[in-house]
Regions:
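Short beta-edge strand/loop motif at the mouth of beta-sheet-based domains
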Residues: 20, 39-83, 163-170
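Hydrophobic pocket/interface hotspot
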Residues: 32, 42, 58, 90, ...
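Hydrophobic ligand-binding cavity/cleft-lining segments
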Residues: 1-51
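Hydrophobic-ligand binding "helix-grip"
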Residues: 51, 64-131
Length: 180
């Protein structure tokens, strides 16, 4: 098989309040869809909680400690997110094609995941719109970039030793991408 993921668009700002990321994942659409919608699988790369359903509520439980295979300290800057639960609304649900839900209980816009088959792989396009914070592009871009990297590793059957180290590298990469 090819690499676990190809970063086709690291992150780009498509509007003042919108960022877009694109990845080519080494897994079929059916598998990627399950990792987006099933709480137990989503917990392995992003946030657990309830399963996503059409026109449903979506509880996201953020347990970033579970994303690292090594025991690593939780950065002070993100301590307020440890164990956080957010209650989101699924606003678009097209099985194996599109999942969109509010973010930050609606205060931080909408995250939309689009899936496109590419042979035995999946092209995932993530668009986060309605970002209100002036630093939101960097904050959400680095968060999504690091979480998508974890997803790619999980799909390849691998673990991530230190999520927070990955997040720090993602933040640097995203900052450079959004400058240009």
């Amino acid at each position: 098989m090819a690499e676990a993921t190809a970063i086709t668009v690291p992150v780009e700002r498509t509007a003042p309040d919108t960022i877009r990321l694109e990845r080519l994942l080494d897994a079929p659409v059916d598998t990627v869809w399950r990792y987006l919608t099933e709480g137990e699988l989503r917990a392995q790369w992003f946030a657990g909680g309830s399963d996503a359903r059409a026109d449903g509520e979506l509880d996201l439980v953020f347990e970033h400690d579970n994303l690292s295979s090594d025991e690593v300290p939780y950065p002070e800057a993100y301590a307020s997110h440890k164990g956080a639960v957010s209650h989101e609304k699924v606003v678009r649900f097209e099985p194996k094609r599109v999942l969109a839900f509010t973010f930050g209980e609606g205060r931080n816009g909408v995250a939309t995941f689009e899936l496109f088959p590419d042979g035995e792989r999946t092209r995932l396009v993530l668009t986060h719109s309605g970002i209100q914070s002036p630093t939101g592009g960097l904050d959400f871009g680095s968060g999504w970039s690091s979480h998508l990297a974890v997803l790619a590793e999980r799909l390849a059957g691998r673990t991530v030793r230190n999520f927070w180290e990955l997040h720090a590298r993602s933040r640097e990469t995203v900052a450079k991408a959004l400058e240009g």
